[in-house]
Amino acid sequence: MTKKLHIKTWGCQMNEYDSSKMADLLASTHGYQLTTIPEEADLLLLNTCSIREKAQEKVFSLLGQWKLLKEKNPQLIIGVGGCVASQEGEQLRQRAPCVDVIFGPQTLHRLPEMINHVQGTNSPVVDISFPEIEKFDRLPEPRAEGPTAFVSIMEGCNKYCTFCVVPYTRGEEVSRPSDDILFEIAQLAAQGVREVNLLGQNVNAYRGATYDGDICSFAELLRLVAAIDGIDRVRFTTSHPIEFTDDIIDVYRDTPELVSFLHLPVQSGSDRILTMMKRAHTALEYKAIIRKLRQARPDIQISSDFIVGFPGETQQDFEQTMKLVADIHFDTSYSFIYSPRPGTPAADLPNNVSEEEKKQRLHILQQRISQQAMEISRKMVGTVQRVLVEGTSRKNVMELAGRTENNRVVNFEGSPDMIGKFVDVEIVNVYASSLRGILLRTEDQMDLRTHESPQSVIARTRKENEIGVGIYQP
């Protein structure tokens, strides 16, 4: 009888990536098949996030529901991973004794052994250690699920912003070797992936070892990824302003595969608050980065993260944030009310901004950025946009949907054979969360790089010397 696995994932794209790797790993080692129905599962895994306080409380609420399933099926194994698991450790089992396996973001590759331990001894296991890069060496080969894919290139963060738990839950920065990353992306490209999104908590701090013992910078990695045959779009998230160096900006100047969209968190427009957050940059320095980016790529759109109601934030501080929002003209944002996280320096600061004031500031900020996003969308009407077709439209299965470089969803009429390929569409209408397009040309009418085999490369590069002997010059 086939064993079933149900995974619930909360949090960032890195968690989504980790969950997909867990599913692949357990399919290869134990034959588990994914199910969307928890009641069918033999193994329940919860991949958690501890960035927000509410997300942490949601963990124990869901575990209360899963406890009822375990009472009906004592053989059911329940595992909790991710940042809450890393932060809580053994204390998690004290609040939720139904949990059998507790693992951190850096130990998910040990899940098969942990599950075997539980099955063999009927006792729980906890492993929230930080074995650095080991997890990537023990994960199965990548498996494409559509034309886009996430690839983790580094983990952890050394910045220790006063509000953030990431350095404590995912450890300090560790970069994967560049050759491993390029090989994984080449494997995905061979399976039809056209767009790759490079992941890391502080992705532009990447410094990976090369095969010859040198160090590959993030800018160098971007160019190498863009050169992989079949990869026509490159994205990355999430980056930090103090690591956004001029050599990265130069890649925007000369590498068209790198999309004209950047998520660059700033958190606040007040230098005083930025100092209290230990962000190590000013609002003016952030604006200077954006100015240089727009010189290199005039059509680039910027999104960001904001925290409102940070301890000590005054009305003047908030107004400086709103001024930055207007100056940069952000496209989208992920904005939140400050939530103190246990163990972080900011948690010890007096939280002297009222809840009512926090909610009002958040509403003003989100409303302004939504207005700016709509202005940008309206300016796209009449333009031709290259869209990567991801599948059928959510609202009408007779239509197709894809994404522009600046991450707008476009719905248009087309044929199923366009899925997984690029098309050019003219934008003709704007809606709250999508655009309407008319198909202009398909991929076979574009000058994109074709997939090449070793034989085609040899044939293309073959030359003959003076006596007619074939030589090859790659």
From Swiss-Prot:
It comes from Yersinia pestis. The lineage of its organism: Bacteria, Pseudomonadati, Pseudomonadota, Gammaproteobacteria, Enterobacterales. Binds 2 [4Fe-4S] clusters. One cluster is coordinated with 3 cysteines and an exchangeable S-adenosyl-L-methionine. SMART domains: Elp3. It catalyses: N(6)-dimethylallyladenosine(37) in tRNA + (sulfur carrier)-SH + AH2 + 2 S-adenosyl-L-methionine = 2-methylsulfanyl-N(6)-dimethylallyladenosine(37) in tRNA + (sulfur carrier)-H + 5'-deoxyadenosine + L-methionine + A + S-adenosyl-L-homocysteine + 2 H(+). It comes from the Bacteria. The gene is miaB. Residues 3-120 form the MTTase N-terminal domain. This is tRNA-2-methylthio-N(6)-dimethylallyladenosine synthase. Its cofactor is [4Fe-4S] cluster. Its EC number is 2.8.4.3. One of its GO terms (cellular component) is cytosol. Monomer. Residues 143-375 form the Radical SAM core domain. [4Fe-4S] cluster 2 binds at C157, C161, C164. Catalyzes the methylthiolation of N6-(dimethylallyl)adenosine (i(6)A), leading to the formation of 2-methylthio-N6-(dimethylallyl)adenosine (ms(2)i(6)A) at position 37 in tRNAs that read codons beginning with uridine. One of its GO terms (biological process) is tRNA methylthiolation. [4Fe-4S] cluster 1 binds at C12, C49, C83. Belongs to the methylthiotransferase family. MiaB subfamily. Keywords: 4Fe-4S, Cytoplasm, Iron, Iron-sulfur, Metal-binding, S-adenosyl-L-methionine, Transferase, tRNA processing. Residues 378-441 form the TRAM domain. It is found in: Cytoplasm. The keyword Iron-sulfur applies.
